[in-house]
Amino acid sequence: MCIRDSHYAEATGLLLARTGLSPADVAALGVHGQTIRHRPQKGFTLQLNHPALVAELTGIDVVADLRSRDVAAGGEGAPLVPAFHAECFTGDVPRVVLNIGGIANISVLPARSESPTILGGDTGPGNMLIDTWTQRITGALYDRDGRWAASGRVSTTLLDNLLSEPYFALPIPKSTGRELFSPAWLDARLCGHESLPPEDVARTLVELTARTITNTVARFAPDAAELYVCGGGVYNKTLMQAIASHFPGLTATTEALGVPPMEVEAAAFAWLAERFLASLPGNLPAVTRAAGPRILGALYPR
């Protein structure tokens, strides 16, 4: 845990050097940490980090523990980024912003002139199962550019088995994580498919991510005119092609909106920290199911 937090501090130092700012110029850091347990139904969510240490190492106030207040109000504690997406990415036409991390989630944004109601939720696994399988079979941390998966074929029988997971039929808002889509979940779904070439399994897992995303968008954002993608999944070309095939001409990355895909989530948690400092709510109850708007986070002074 201390190693992770020293990396946060090191990254902060590099960013300050690049921008010419000093710690005194920064109001606070929004530090999320690594989620290791997310059980909102049981009333808790747990992220590994040491915000007091980050504050000590950087000399900057830290806002952390950004999910638990929403959970305490009966919410899912996730996803939190739709509020930021709405603030930054709302346009003149209905849009969907898709974040593909370990888990994939969408923000359904009405046009600026329409009802302000915003929807959002986790569609299911993003890179999580793809990476699990890649690491198990090839030893690589991830399938670079989706090249290994591209060498395989989609198994319709395996895909149907994967898609039978009840979570996928639930309406948004909803959230999920490694508690459900674990290596054990994958192993159980692979039973009876042992003869499949491993590259076919890889390609089918890519299709699972693409299909659960596109099914959710079609179900809850049928009028969306634009789909913008962010997160690490944008660098999996096979996955991006699979998604774009369902939305020809509508799909781009958030780079087109002025925010690099790998910076969106970091910007979102900086924005949540800013909301905390201003005593403003950071959640969207329509997205998380919380009882109402809540100020998210806890302060760790420098």
Which residues fall in each region the model found?
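Conserved phosphate-binding/catalytic loops in two-lobed NTP-binding clefts
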Residues: 244-268
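Conserved small/polar residues in nucleotide/adenosyl-binding loops
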Residues: 1-6
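Phosphate-binding/catalytic loop of phosphoryl-transfer enzymes
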Residues: 40-45, 52-56, 60-141, 295
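Glycine-rich phosphate-binding loops at beta-strand->alpha-helix junctions
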Residues: 36, 224-243
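Short Gly/Thr/Asp-enriched flexible loops that form oxyanion-binding sites at enzyme active sites
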Residues: 35-52, 239-244
